[in-house]
Amino acid sequence: GLFNDNKKDIHEIIIETHEPALRIISNKKDLNNSSDRDHSLEYMVSAALIFKEITSDTYSDNFHGIDEVNALRKKIKVIENKEFTKNYYEISKRHISNEIYFKYKDGSLSIKEKVETPIGHPNRRNEAVPFLKEKFVKNAFPYLKEEEANNLWENILQIDIQSEFEELLNILNND
């Protein structure tokens, strides 16, 4: 990939994002525990670039790659992209845009990779279902057999969320 093929030549990694992300999860300070790491955009991006995935273990104090992730994290610069902020607050869009690119030691820049609506965004919820199922089955494994987890997943998908929510509201409103 773009990162692994050129990582020795990377001087800086630039992430353009919206203001709330900059304010809430950009964290260049020392990360002293899993909660700190889980709330650091720089940590998450570094781990994803190096290991191609992020799991709950990625945030643990005993994670084998923590030093490598922290070293790469120091090369990351997070900046606000005003257009991303505008699109984040625009009700008809509610984009959660991010763009990443690399500045190399020779001063050149990589191609920019931009995502306006990540998987899980309301505009892409259906795309998230296979990933959510995989995660559900994997995390249910210690408690359920695979077949049981799959059956439970299928039953969850059959729930009529709207009517269930309305029923809950009626109960809360004493109707």
Where are these regions (language model features)?
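Terminal-appendage/accessory-domain detector
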Residues: G1-D175
